[in-house]
C-alpha cells in the first residue's frame, strides 16, 4: 500500500510540475503577443500623425495668405 501511495504522489507531483511549466510558457507567449500588438498600435498612431502634417501645412499656408 505504501508503494502505491508513493507512486500516486510521484505521478501527482510530476503532473503538477508539468502543468506549472506549461502555464508559464503560455503566459510568456501571451505577453509577447501583447507587446507586438502594442507596437503595431503605436506605429499606426505615428502613421496617422505623420499623415496629418501635410494637411496642417496646407492649412497654415492658407491662413497665412488670408492674413
Curated annotation (Swiss-Prot):
Subcellular locations according to the entry: Secreted; Target cell membrane
Keyword Mitochondrion: no
Post-translational modification comment from the UniProt entry: In the synthetic mutant medusin-PT1a [T58K], the Leu-50 has been modified in a D-amino acid. In medusin-PT1a, there is an increase in antimicrobial activity, and an increase in hemolytic activity. It is more potent against S.aureus and gains activity against MRSA, E.faecalis, E.coli, P.aeruginosa and C.albicans. There is an important increase in both biofilm inhibition and biofilm eradication.
Taxonomy, superkingdom: Eukaryota
Gene Ontology, cellular component aspect: extracellular region; membrane; other organism cell membrane
Protein name: Medusin-PT
Tissues expressing the protein: Expressed by the skin glands.
Organism listed in the record: Phyllomedusa tarsius
Amino acid at each position: 500500500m505504501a508503494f502505491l501511495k508513493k507512486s500516486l504522489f510521484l505521478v501527482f507531483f510530476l503532473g503538477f510540475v508539468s502543468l506549472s511549466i506549461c502555464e508559464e510558457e503560455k503566459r510568456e507567449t501571451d505577453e509577447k503577443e501583447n507587446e507586438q500588438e502594442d507596437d503595431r498600435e503605436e506605429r499606426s498612431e505615428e502613421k496617422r500623425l505623420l499623415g496629418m502634417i501635410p494637411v496642417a501645412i496646407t492649412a497654415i499656408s492658407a491662413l497665412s495668405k488670408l492674413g
